[in-house]
From Swiss-Prot:
GO terms for cellular component: nucleus. The keyword Metal-binding applies. It holds the Pfam family Zn_clus. The gene is nirA. This is Nitrogen assimilation transcription factor nirA. PANTHER family: TY1 ENHANCER ACTIVATOR. It comes from Emericella nidulans (strain FGSC A4 / ATCC 38163 / CBS 112.46 / NRRL 194 / M139) (Aspergillus nidulans).
Length: 892
């Protein structure tokens, strides 16, 4: 009994003995003490089944005997949970009772709630009241479950009805066309018998396929003309304004079967647009008046809208036709009517649900889904063009749009595109059309354009005006998006020589957005601008305008302006406002002259270009801009040729002032050999050439209207054009009367050019050897062989590349101007000095095709003679200062 125990032995026997011995020893040697009773033992003592004294932080057994870690965990003792179970159940019952009563009071009607309160106040036990409420709820739920089980056989119909009632959208066929019906509409309950027939009896027949093409219009039965105009439309207008499925259209067009992809309204609208790209007599209502191009087909389209009640039956082809009618009216300068047509198109697009993803709709084929998508994104482009053109908020926004991007169809993308003219197709610049790829890129630009216009050009009053920091943040965001778009552009769509016309227009649209982005910041000074010091909004606008001018010159060299969409007129106008701002800088002078000539050429096809010239003419006078001589000449020529645009034009036009009578006197003027009056008038009432701006009465107020600056030198190719033009026209005794526009312009007549001037004709017709000798003596620097658009990487390189040939070395192009004073009145000069007088040659149009790159200037006779200008035409130009007055449109 007295041997020492080993603590490593089993915990039962030895430990018990040791405890007994210890207790015995303690009883013998020390006074007796009662052990403290603890409710919870440590984990080690519970595992050993030994008694624990509950001492903290460690019990005696763990610290003295077993030397183990002592941990107390009351929650781990599951044997004591029954002690609290009764209390827990009681609390849970009370909480459930109170919760049941409170929910009943909240959900009961007013009278029932008062009854329940009285029952609670008079009851002996709240649990009984709560239990009665629970029983009532169980009875109600049991009745609902029995009702559901009873209707299991008709569950499919019930689900359909409930889904139509509770759904956010629905789709049905109404009036023979698919329409979007929203969740709040009751039209979903219309029975199937309410559908109407979409087509008239007898139209939807195959019949004779050979004559099916001529069934679409009553204007003409010339199948060749119809085919020619449609080809014009699909070659020049459709690639940019892609708003329909070409394959589906031609499928039904060739059959002569009206459908949602082809109708007489759509065909006549296409023909009206195709007329603007053709000079065939059948393309004009009046063959002798280019202002009537497409009017006869457009009148037929307007008749069809009323006669066929096209606005009642919403169809894809009607949406497309109305959108095309709107852009055609804009090209004719009738924005009011065009805006209404666009609104009808967009409303019908919403009616058809084109702004929603079509793949979720029922019973739609793949071709119909594709046609709906391409139609919507076409309307999206029309909307953004109208928004920019009129400065109004867009109708389609990203918030109300959930349509996927257009599908790139390999067959259509690989179809060969080639320039098409009145002479037929040309193999030059033939390449894959890439119509859908360009349309997708333009759609991305349109999204950016919409956000730009909404933020910077929304005139609606706001609760809190935009701060400079917010404007800077939004500007940075949109600029980043534009740069990302340009960076992600496929290589085959970059601007280059021979690029697709729609791709060039797309790049012009991109530069237009840059101008619109930075133009609102022109109102700030350098000290008040929120932009960083190194960022100049004027410089960025100038770079974008210069890029547009370069793209227009590239388009002219490649395709000419007879075939170009009218959106280019608006883009050119916007760029010219920036160039006017920068006058009299050399680059601005060049771009203004080129831009006005481009608009003059576009005016042959689009009336809006004629009006744009009048607007720029009046704006330049209002802003007191120093215009180059060539710009003044273009303004006077076009005004004499096309007349005034309206009362607003006549009130401000220099050609309708009191000093300028409407017609020239019929008295004959004797021709002289004095070169101060190189062209004279002759007797008779013969009509004059409208392009000759030589009438003193016509050009009398020019000096008072403009502050003309010396222009740059003229190229040898321009001199050659002048020589050809003048020599060809001297033999003509009669010239055409200026063609009147439908707006009844002010008529101006001129005397014919006398034909008995053999000496001057000889003077203007040097031999080819003399011409080569002259060009060798006055060699000019040539442009780089590099493509003019290969340096579009940075704006700095772009502006640097835009330094054109005539402004690089003005001393090499003075062409003997210093000798004009002494030879001015010495009679007819010899042929060796012919070209010194090239600037005084009137611009008499040649019967042959005009020079593709240059139209010679025609100075008015009352303008100062060349010896009144300094030798260097740009010597006094200060590039850092300008007399330009900011237009009101640039200021908020």
């Amino acid at each position: 009994m007295g041997e020492k125990l080993d603590p490593e032995l089993s915990s039962d026997g030895p430990h018990t003995k040791s405890s007994s011995k210890g207790q015995g020893t303690s009883t013998d040697n020390a006074p007796a003490s009662k052990r403290r009773c603890v409710s919870t033992a440590c984990i080690a003592c519970r595992r050993r089944k030994s008694k624990c004294d509950g001492n903290l932080p460690s019990c005696a057994a763990c610290s003295s005997v077993y030397h183990t870690t002592c941990v107390y965990d009351p929650n781990s003792d599951h044997r004591r949970k029954g002690v609290y179970k009764k209390d827990t159940d009681t609390l849970r019952t009370k909480n459930s009772t109170l919760l049941t009563l409170i929910q009943a009071l909240l959900n009961y009607e007013e009278e029932d709630a008062f009854d329940l309160v009285r029952q609670i106040r008079s009851c002996d036990n709240l649990e009984d009241v709560a239990q009665s409420l629970v029983n009532q709820e169980k009875k109600s739920s049991g009745w609902l479950s029995n009702a559901v089980i009873h209707e299991e056989n008709d569950i499919a119909q019930t689900d359909q009805f409930e889904s139509e009632l509770a759904g956010k959208m629905s789709n049905l066929v109404l009036d023979g066309s698919r329409k979007f019906i929203g969740g709040t509409s009751n039209l979903i309950f219309l029975p199937p018998g309410s559908e109407l027939n979409e087509f008239k009896p007898g139209l939807a027949t195959n019949g004779d396929l050979e004559g099916s093409v001529t069934r679409w219009t009553t204007v003409t039965d010339d199948q060749q003309l119809i085919s020619h105009l449609l080809t014009m439309y699909f070659s020049w207008h459709y690639p940019f304004f892609t708003t329909l499925s070409k394959e589906l259209f031609y499928r039904d067009y060739s059959r002569g079967v009206p459908s949602q992809y082809c109708s007489s309204l759509l065909v006549n609208t296409m023909l009206a647009l195709g007329c603007h790209f053709s000079s065939w007599p059948g393309a004009r209502e009046d063959p002798d008046n280019s202002a009537t191009a497409g009017d006869h087909f457009f009148k037929e389209a307007k008749r069809l809208i009323l006669d066929n009640d096209e606005l009642v039956n919403s169809k894809l082809c009607t949406v497309q036709a109305l959108a095309l009618m709107s852009v055609r009216e804009a090209g004719c300068g009738r924005e009011g009517k065009g805006w209404v047509y666009s609104g009808m198109s967009f409303r019908m697009a919403f009616d058809l649900g084109l702004n929603l993803e079509s793949s979720s709709l029922r019973d739609l084929s793949e071709e119909e889904i594709d046609a709906r998508r391409i139609t919507f994104w076409g309307c999206f482009l029309f909307d953004k063009c109208w928004s920019n053109y009129l400065g109004r908020q867009p109708q389609f926004t990203t918030a109300n749009t959930s349509v996927s991007a257009v599908d790139i169809l390999p067959n259509e993308e690989s179809t060969l595109w080639s320039p098409y003219s009145d002479m037929g197709p040309s193999r030059e610049y033939a390449q894959p059309s890439r119509t859908r790829a360009v349309a997708d890129q333009i759609s991305q630009l349109c999204k950016i354009s919409g956000d730009l216009v909404v933020f910077f050009y929304d005139l609606a009053p706001k609760e809190k005006p935009s701060s400079k920091q917010l404007e800077l943040k939004k500007l940075s965001e949109i600029h980043t998006r534009l740069e990302a778009w340009k960076k992600g552009l496929p290589k085959e769509l970059e601007p280059r020589e021979g690029q697709l016309p729609q791709a060039l227009l797309m790049h012009m649209f991109y530069q237009l957005l840059l101008i619109h982005l930075y133009r609102p910041f022109l109102k700030y000074t350098k000290s008040t601008s929120p932009l960083p010091q190194h960022v100049s909004p004027r410089k960025l606008c100038t770079q974008a305008a210069a890029a547009i001018s370069k793209l227009l010159r590239l388009y002219k060299r490649t395709y000419g302006f007879k075939q170009i969409c009218n959106i280019a007129v608006y883009i050119a106008h916007t760029a010219l406002t920036i160039h006017l701002l920068n006058l009299p800088e050399k680059n601005a002078q060049r771009d203004v002259i080129h831009g006005l000539r481009h608009l003059e050429e576009m005016g042959e096809s689009w009336l809006c270009a004629r009006r744009t010239l009048r607007i720029l003419d009046i704006s330049a006078s209002k802003w007191q801009v120093q215009l180059p001589r060539e710009a003044v000449i273009v303004f006077e020529q076009t005004h004499a040729r096309w007349g005034s645009w309206g009362p607003w034009d006549q009130a401000a036009s220099p050609s309708t002032t009191s000093d300028s009578p409407p017609s020239v006197s019929s008295q004959s003027v004797v021709a002289t050999t004095d070169l101060s009056q190189p062209v004279s008038q002759s007797a008779g009432n013969q009509p004059a050439n409208p392009s000759m701006g030589t009438s003193p009465n016509l050009t009398q107020p020019v000096a008072s209207q403009y502050s003309s600056t010396p222009s740059g030198p003229v190229s040898v190719s321009a001199m050659r054009a002048v020589q050809r033009s003048f020599s060809a026209q001297l033999a003509h005794n009669e010239a055409r009367q200026p063609e009147p526009t439908y707006l009844r312009p002010v008529s101006t007549s001129y005397g014919p050019v006398p034909s008995t001037q053999s000496a001057q004709e000889q003077w203007y017709s040097p031999t080819e050897a003399q011409f080569r000798a002259f060009t060798a003596a006055h060699s000019m620097p040539t442009t780089s062989a590099q493509s003019p658009l290969t340096t579009f990487d940075t704006p700095e390189n772009l502006v640097e590349e835009s330094q054109d040939w005539w402004s690089r070395d003005v001393n090499a192009l003075q062409l003997g101007a210093e000798d004009w004073t002494q030879n001015w009145n010495n009679g007819l000069p010899t042929t060796s000095a012919d070209w010194r007088y090239v600037d005084n040659v009137p611009n008499i149009p040649s019967t042959s095709a005009p020079d593709a790159d240059y139209k010679p200037p025609q100075p008015p006779p009352n303008m100062a003679r060349p010896n009144q200008y300094p030798t260097d035409p740009v010597a006094n130009v200060n590039s850092n200062q300008t007399n330009m007055i900011f237009p009101g449109s640039f200021q908020r």
